[in-house]
């Protein structure tokens, strides 16, 4: 909930149109409703594991992009966020696929048969898509921060840019 508060504050700094801000607020409420509805539905069978794997894939995406981008560097990905590189984007995808797959296999070994997750081509594609969406989320928040002329979205996590920066993927 705190990240949505930070997101709405960011929008308030950029846009002055009350109608636009109302529409954004409506979509935040709608998103929260569907997100929590999904959580309730996922609790039926293996929902916690699915949510955990989604969160882990976003974490691996962020870590992979940062580590590979810093180590290899190379051409910039976009002017929206000048520290993002093409090598970082590829590292993000690789870390997501390898890290999340390893975590899911570990989770399956720890809790025998808890999730029937067999690594397949479809899961491979889904992990790539997850990484790409995580990177887009990061770029969108970077764009909004640049437009609002702020470095961090909040101060609850010093050095991390705020809650929104941690979960933007």
Predicted regions and their residues:
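Membrane-embedded alpha-helical bundles of polytopic integral membrane proteins
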Residues: 1-128, 132
